[in-house]
Every structure is written in structure tokens, then in C-alpha cells.
């Protein structure tokens, strides 16, 4: 009799749980199918160019793909890409050129989507400091942030433009110190991201700086990309596709309405940015987005990567050159 009572009690409890789940809109199958946890780690602190991914997160595009995505800050491209290579993270979001160099050094990572065909790097000076071409950097000091892309690219940039490297005083420091030193005019010039640093600096100083666009002077290397652990991507192709589909939707929305994307991103910032600066950052970033006609956002052709490898090889920044498919793939894009 007691066994029958226990069975009845268990059945009653099960029925109650099922009823509660159905009332809450959760089916037993859905309860078992937990969302796949994914971390996308940026290679730097939060900035306007990351807005499309937060749009995808905010609008539920990742969730709709069955993903539980965490968007996390980083502290430098080399560090974050290495974390992906050793399997500590699944994805890095940052400069493709650093991933290319990592692959050549046998780190098992691969670029699965490229969102900027060219890295928006620049060098600025105050109006009274002449700066029209790279040659003008001779005899001047140049502030560079440790861990940022240009710190690795400054030598090839100067070499490409016939600048005597020994005549340029390169001063490496952290991001906040770099800006402080430049604002106090203790350094003559400063390396910046045109999509992030420049809008902020111009807003703070109310100054129109002299600007060298690095890409316009020959150093055109692929920019923002999603970089995956190679083995993990091969073992989880559908998860990679889901991440790229959702991210592309965030990009499409941000391209269609940069102002709304900036407002969405602002919600996720602990330290709020000036709304005008943030909107300008997003607009400039969206204008540089790699969205080829008739192809998915993030798709690239072989010529882009061949040109990148040629440039890095010619300037001595690529010790070992591998086959193109070692560096990138379009296979996960739909």
C-alpha cells in the first residue's frame, strides 16, 4: 500500500512540475535543450566599433540561435588571440592582421569572418605640428599604445614610406598615459584608431587635428574579424554558423541605423560615453564595414588575404608564409 502511495505522490509531483513548466511557457524538450554557452572576447576595452555585436545581443539574435553569448573585454590582441589558440576562449573579436601573424607562428586559430577590409589606423598631431605625410614623422616623437595593432605595424608602415626609423622616437605606453602625454604636448604625434580615438579626442579638445590615414599611405591590412579556435570550429561548425548569422544581423541593423545602434550600445557601458561621440564612432565604423554585394557580411576573397600576406612578407612582419586557407575561411558564412 505504501508503495502505491509513493508512486501516486511521485506522479502528482511530476504532474505539478509539468503544469508549472507549461504555465511558464517552457516545454520539457526546451528545458532539456539548454542554450550553448559562447564567449566572444574583444581584443580591447569596450568601444564604439563593437556596437553591432551588442545590437545582436540586445535584440536576441544570439538567443534565437540557441546561444547564450557573453561579450567580454580584452587587454590586447596578442593576449586574447593566444587565449583562443590554447582553447581558453572560443572566439576573439579584433584585428585580423594579428591573427594572420599568430597563424604563421603555428597558433591554431582561424579567421571565420572579416568585418573590416582595412584596419582604420591613423597618426595625429596638433595643428601647429606639421604632419602631412609619414616622412613628417622624422625628428618627432610618436606615442603608441602597448598591445594595439599599430604597435606591431609601425615598423612596416615607416619602411613602406621610406621613413628613417631611427629618426622617429617611438614611445610605448598604456592607453590612458598615451592620451595624457599627447594632450599635454609631451609627445608630438599619437597613433589612433580613426573609428574610436579620433572622434573622442576631437570632442574633448575641440580641435581639428592633422591626420595621416595609415591605409592611404600603403599599410592596408585587414581589420576587425571574428577569430575562432581552429579545432573547436571544425568540431562545432553549426555553432560557428549560428554565431556568424546572429552577428551579421547585428551588423545589418547597425548599418541601417547607426544612431539606434549607438543608443543600444550605451546601455552596456559602465562608464557612459558622450552620445554624440559614440554615435560618430558607430557611424564611422559602419561606413568601413566589409559587406560585399551579393555575399554575406564578413565574406572576403583570396585577393584580400594574398595582398595582406604580400605586405607582411615584404616588410619582414611574416616569418613563415602558409597557404591562404590556413588563415581564413568563408565556409561558415551563410
Q: Which residues fall in each region the model found?
A:
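N-terminal secretory signal peptides that target proteins for export/translocation
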Residues: 1-6
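Bacterial N-terminal signal peptides
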Residues: 10-25
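Sec/Tat signal peptide C-region and signal peptidase I cleavage site
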Residues: 26-32
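Short, glycine-/small- and polar/acidic-enriched structural segments
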Residues: 32-184, 188-195, 212-214, 220
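Pocket-lining segment of extracytoplasmic ligand-binding domains
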Residues: 97, 177-181, 185-271
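Short, surface-exposed acidic
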Residues: 165-169, 271-282, 318-326
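Secondary-structure end/capping motifs
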Residues: 235-315
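Conserved C-terminal helix/tail region of periplasmic/extracytoplasmic solute-binding proteins
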Residues: 305-334
Amino acid at each position: 500500500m505504501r508503495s502505491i502511495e509513493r508512486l501516486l505522490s511521485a506522479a502528482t509531483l511530476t504532474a505539478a512540475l509539468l503544469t508549472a513548466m507549461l504555465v511558464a511557457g517552457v516545454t520539457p524538450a526546451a528545458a532539456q535543450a539548454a542554450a550553448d554557452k559562447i564567449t566572444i572576447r574583444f581584443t580591447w576595452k569596450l568601444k564604439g566599433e563593437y556596437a553591432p555585436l551588442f545590437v545582436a545581443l540586445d535584440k536576441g539574435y544570439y538567443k534565437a540561435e540557441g546561444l547564450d553569448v557573453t561579450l567580454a573585454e580584452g587587454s590586447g590582441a596578442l593576449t586574447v588571440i593566444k587565449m583562443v589558440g590554447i582553447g581558453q576562449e572560443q572566439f576573439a573579436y579584433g584585428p585580423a592582421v594579428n591573427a594572420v601573424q599568430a597563424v604563421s607562428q603555428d597558433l591554431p586559430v582561424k579567421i571565420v569572418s572579416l568585418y573590416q577590409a582595412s584596419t582604420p589606423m591613423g597618426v595625429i598631431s596638433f595643428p601647429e605640428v606639421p604632419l602631412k605625410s609619414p616622412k613628417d614623422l622624422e625628428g618627432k616623437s610618436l606615442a603608441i599604445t602597448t598591445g594595439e595593432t599599430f604597435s606591431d605595424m609601425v615598423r612596416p608602415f615607416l619602411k613602406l614610406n621610406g621613413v628613417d626609423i631611427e629618426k622617429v622616437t617611438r614611445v610605448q605606453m598604456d592607453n590612458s598615459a598615451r592620451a595624457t602625454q599627447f594632450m599635454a604636448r609631451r609627445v608630438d604625434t599619437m597613433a589612433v584608431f580613426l573609428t574610436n580615438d579620433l572622434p573622442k579626442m576631437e570632442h574633448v579638445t575641440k580641435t581639428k587635428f592633422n591626420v595621416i590615414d595609415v591605409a592611404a599611405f600603403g599599410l592596408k591590412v585587414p581589420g576587425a574579424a571574428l577569430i575562432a579556435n581552429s579545432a573547436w570550429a571544425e568540431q562545432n561548425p553549426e555553432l560557428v554558423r549560428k554565431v556568424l548569422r546572429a552577428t551579421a544581423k547585428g551588423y545589418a541593423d547597425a548599418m541601417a541605423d547607426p544612431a539606434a545602434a549607438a543608443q543600444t550600445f550605451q546601455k552596456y557601458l559602465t562608464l557612459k560615453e558622450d552620445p554624440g561621440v559614440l554615435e560618430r564612432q558607430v557611424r564611422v565604423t559602419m561606413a568601413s564595414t566589409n559587406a560585399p554585394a551579393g555575399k554575406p557580411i564578413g565574406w572576403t576573397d583570396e585577393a584580400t588575404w594574398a595582398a595582406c600576406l604580400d605586405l607582411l612578407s615584404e616588410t619582414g612582419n611574416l616569418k613563415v608564409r602558409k597557404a591562404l586557407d590556413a588563415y581564413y575561411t568563408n565556409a561558415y558564412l551563410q
